[in-house]
């Protein structure tokens, strides 16, 4: 996609949405729930509506200096905000608005790509795609600016794929009356490769996972197949139900028909809620999976503790409401409903072990994924292991956890 085409696409997509409703104002709450949200906001004292994933975004490929420049422009904006306490709630698509500033950074990378060739152009386009994806974060279904940003992210990703030295194929896997869109990443097509199915959480896209392949899996000649969770990204048309691993299960069962992968050597990686789905799949399809790794996954504790869910920041509650298709939210009812998402309540972590060795990791003090959840997963997995990552060395912690993850998969897939 040339710079001119990209600029035109951006203008076409966003022109109708100059006065689009700001993200934090999209989800409606019952009066009693609104009072609770006000209480939580006052207690937490956060300056941002969004949970800023600075280190995760840097690991995924955002330049840390550029990231801070974008956040500084948002924070210093003089434009009106939906909520003056939250810096990232600038209304209208212009300077200071979250989607605008991240899209602008994406455009800069896209422009740079136009001045480069081959691998350098490809990397600049992958960076552009990631910036567009962050522009849409946390990807609420009713957020028009986020939907347009996602179009740009997907377009830049496919353009980057064409210029890359690696082989990236967009697959359409039949499911129910539609198709699941997945991306297969390969070092070559000379022979079938071991493959890892990767899923992110409920507030990120499959196109965010490029660096996991380039910096980790490709070095070991392991293919990566990315799939969005139901209700997100390419899978947004599929509702999020208690059977939330069904898309990944359909993809797993279709692997035998893909000539580039060895369907006898399959691993799983799940981040955040994607980790919950991967553990679930490790019980449902244990004969087809060699190993599984989860990072920061909510498994039981948060779902079984309505009080904890009720105290979550608004962005997380907005995401849950959006994924479940709720137009008006009752937090008390929502927190009770979430118990059904616990893998213990569903009966998976209660009696028999899965044959799949699962490595369950999370950051020390993570409120969504406590160590007790990981211990439970490890206990119900043959040769399973729970690992706590020290938050004192969070930057190193990210790298350490990924190195551990790759080693875990390598031991099972490459022997």
Swiss-Prot record:
Keywords carried by this UniProt record: Hydrolase, Serine esterase
Enzyme Commission numbers on file: 3.1.1.1
GO terms of molecular function: carboxylesterase activity
Description of pH dependence: Optimum pH is 9.0-9.5.
Catalytic activity: a carboxylic ester + H2O = an alcohol + a carboxylate + H(+)
Temperature impact on function: Optimum temperature is 50 degrees Celsius.
NCBIfam families, sorted: PRK05077.1
Record-linked PANTHER family: DIENELACTONE HYDROLASE DOMAIN-CONTAINING PROTEIN-RELATED, ESTERASE FRSA
Subunit structure: Monomer in solution. Homodimer. Forms a 1:1 complex with the unphosphorylated form of the EIIA component of the glucose-specific PTS system (IIAGlc).
Its job: Catalyzes the hydrolysis of esters. In vitro, prefers short chain alkanoate ester as substrate. Displays highest activity towards p-nitrophenyl acetate (pNPA). Has weaker activity towards p-nitrophenyl butyrate (pNPB).
Family under the similarity heading: Belongs to the FrsA family.
Name of the protein described by the UniProt record: Esterase FrsA
Naturally occurring in which organism (per UniProt): Vibrio vulnificus (strain CMCP6)
């Amino acid at each position: 996609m040339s710079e001119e085409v990209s600029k035109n696409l951006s203008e076409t997509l966003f022109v109708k949405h100059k006065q689009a409703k700001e993200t934090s104002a999209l989800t409606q709450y019952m009066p009693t729930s609104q009072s609770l949200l006000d209480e939580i906001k006052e207690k937490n004292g956060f300056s941002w509506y969004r949970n800023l994933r600075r280190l995760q975004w840097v690991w995924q490929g955002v330049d840390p200096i550029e990231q801070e420049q974008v956040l500084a422009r948002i924070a210093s904006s003089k434009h009106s905000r939906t909520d003056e306490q939250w810096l990232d709630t600038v209304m209208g698509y212009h300077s200071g608005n979250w989607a605008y500033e991240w899209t602008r950074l994406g455009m800069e990378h896209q422009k740079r790509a136009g001045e480069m060739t081959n691998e350098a152009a490809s990397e600049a386009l992958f960076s552009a795609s990631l910036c567009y994806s962050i522009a849409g974060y946390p990807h609420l279904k009713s957020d028009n600016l986020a939907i347009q940003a996602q179009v740009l992210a997907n377009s830049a990703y496919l353009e980057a794929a064409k210029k890359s030295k690696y082989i990236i194929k967009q697959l359409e896997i039949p499911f129910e009356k539609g198709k699941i869109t997945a991306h297969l990443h390969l070092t070559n097509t000379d022979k079938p490769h071991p493959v890892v199915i990767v899923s992110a959480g409920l507030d990120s896209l499959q196109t965010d996972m490029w660096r996991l392949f380039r910096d980790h899996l490709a070095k070991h000649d392991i293919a990566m197949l990315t799939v969005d969770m139901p209700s997100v990204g390419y899978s947004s048309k599929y509702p999020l139900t208690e059977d939330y691993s069904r898309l990944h299960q359909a993809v797993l069962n279709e692997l035998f028909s893909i000539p580039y992968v060895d369907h006898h050597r399959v691993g799983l990686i799940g981040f955040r809620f994607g980790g919950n789905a991967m553990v679930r799949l490790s019980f449902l399809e244990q004969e087809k999976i060699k190993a599984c790794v989860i990072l920061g996954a909510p498994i039981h504790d948060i779902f079984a503790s309505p009080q904890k869910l009720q105290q979550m920041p608004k962005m997380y509650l907005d995401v849950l409401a959006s994924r479940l298709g709720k137009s008006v939210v009752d937090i008390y009812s929502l927190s009770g409903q979430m118990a059904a998402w616990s893998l213990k309540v569903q009966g998976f972590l209660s009696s028999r072990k899965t044959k799949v060795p699962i490595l369950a990791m999370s950051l020390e003090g993570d409120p969504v994924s406590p160590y007790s959840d990981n211990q439970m997963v490890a206990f119900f997995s043959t040769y399973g292991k729970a690992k706590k990552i020290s938050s004192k060395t969070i930057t190193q912690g990210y790298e350490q956890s990924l190195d551990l993850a790759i080693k875990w998969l390598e031991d099972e897939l490459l022997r």
